Curated annotation (Swiss-Prot):
<keyword id="KW-0732">Signal</keyword>
<protein>
    <recommendedName>
        <fullName>C-type lectin domain family 3 member A homolog</fullName>
    </recommendedName>
</protein>
<dbReference type="GO" id="GO:0005615">
    <property type="term" value="C:extracellular space"/>
</dbReference>
<feature type="disulfide bond">
    <location>
        <begin position="66"/>
        <end position="76"/>
    </location>
</feature>
<keyword id="KW-0964">Secreted</keyword>
<feature type="domain" description="C-type lectin">
    <location>
        <begin position="72"/>
        <end position="189"/>
    </location>
</feature>
<feature type="signal peptide">
    <location>
        <begin position="1"/>
        <end position="24"/>
    </location>
</feature>
<feature type="disulfide bond">
    <location>
        <begin position="93"/>
        <end position="188"/>
    </location>
</feature>
<keyword id="KW-1015">Disulfide bond</keyword>
<dbReference type="InterPro" id="IPR018378">
    <property type="entry name" value="C-type_lectin_CS"/>
</dbReference>
<dbReference type="Pfam" id="PF00059">
    <property type="entry name" value="Lectin_C"/>
</dbReference>
<dbReference type="InterPro" id="IPR051663">
    <property type="entry name" value="CLec_Tetranectin-domain"/>
</dbReference>
<dbReference type="InterPro" id="IPR016186">
    <property type="entry name" value="C-type_lectin-like/link_sf"/>
</dbReference>
<keyword id="KW-0430">Lectin</keyword>
<dbReference type="GO" id="GO:0001503">
    <property type="term" value="P:ossification"/>
</dbReference>
<dbReference type="InterPro" id="IPR001304">
    <property type="entry name" value="C-type_lectin-like"/>
</dbReference>
<dbReference type="InterPro" id="IPR016187">
    <property type="entry name" value="CTDL_fold"/>
</dbReference>
Length: 193
């Protein structure tokens, strides 16, 4: 009988140990799962912080641009004395986080004209981010959006040869079409968020 009692005790002890190990494994799995969730949440928070930091850096860079250039409404303009072809000038503006300047109304055009006079010494004209390269006579901005404001000195008749617009200081800020390979000064615009 003592032997039977010992066997029963041994059986229950083994059963109890098995249950304890099973529960321990389940708890460890749950703990690992919670830990992974926390790690995922932490990674999400870190990613969000990096995005915010990058956004702040962009805003700081724009403020620097505005300090060196001029601010008009929700745009900053920055002029460059170096002469470039239309495409090179636009690529340079894009590399800096903007585009060639695109006046959307007469107020912007006049402000851009005045800023160009002040900042581009001895220059009578500079590139605008406007062209009709794709469809002759249909002027679009450098993003491909149709232009709704126009300030032409004369109706562009440059044909396939003159496809890029520039602002002419001598004609009080009127636009003229020009050969895109011409070397001109330029002004970049940056949208302020």
């Amino acid at each position: 009988m003592a032997q039977a009692g010992l066997l029963i005790w041994l059986f229950f002890t083994i059963l109890l140990l098995d249950l304890t190990c099973t529960q321990s494994a389940k708890l460890k799995t749950q703990k690992d799962h919670r830990s992974k969730e926390k790690d995922g949440d932490l990674k999400t928070q870190i990613d969000k912080l990096w995005r915010e930091i990058n956004s702040l850096k962009e805003m700081q860079a724009l403020q620097t641009v505005c300090l060196r250039g001029t601010k008009i409404h929700k745009k900053c303009y920055l002029s460059f004395e170096e002469t470039k072809h239309f495409h090179e000038a636009n690529e340079d503006c894009i590399a800096k986080g903007g585009t060639l300047a695109i006046p959307r109304d007469s107020e912007e055009n006049n402000a851009l004209r005045d800023y160009g006079k002040k900042s581009l010494h001895g220059s009578g004209e500079f590139w605008l981010g406007i062209n009709d390269m794709v469809n002759e006579g249909k002027f679009v901005d450098v993003n491909g959006v149709a232009i709704t404001y126009f300030n032409w000195e004369r109706i562009p008749k440059g044909g396939k040869r003159k496809n890029c617009a520039l602002l002419n200081q001598a004609s009080q800020g009127k636009w003229v079409d020009e050969v895109c390979r011409s070397l001109k000064k330029y002004i970049c615009e940056f949208i302020i968020p």
